[in-house]
């Protein structure tokens, strides 16, 4: 049964890293492990969108990923503090393609996805998160769902672009929006949820 979506829990694949969980929680601050984790992707991904907590890391991480054999990567930092492409501020990007690094900014207004704030996208728990995602993918017309749809489209669009499914970021965003409007995105999410719940109960 092929869904086309996967989730890998890092401590299950990097057994040594699980010993760092306790100290990291005690320190309650960013450490070298926040940088090492994405560089030790157990899937060996050669194409990815990677969010970082500081714009200073964009070039550092993209350079490291190039040295590790990556093909097409976007390392991003939202200037409102998000470690992903933001819809409430510009996003700093270092893109690796064809062995070369390119630096630029993404303005969500360019793609029709600018919003004043992402504060109301914060959730209290997993149930609220799941409900918000389902509402966004399902076409709910509230402002909150529209904002969630925008941030999903921007980041999924970037993934489609670096993954070779779209020729540009703009085309990737359009593909992502099309998948949501058609219901295909929600259908895939529900199939993934069903599969993982069945596996968890096995």
Briefly describe each language-model feature range.
Residues 1-202:
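Glycine-rich anion-binding loops and their surrounding alpha/beta cores
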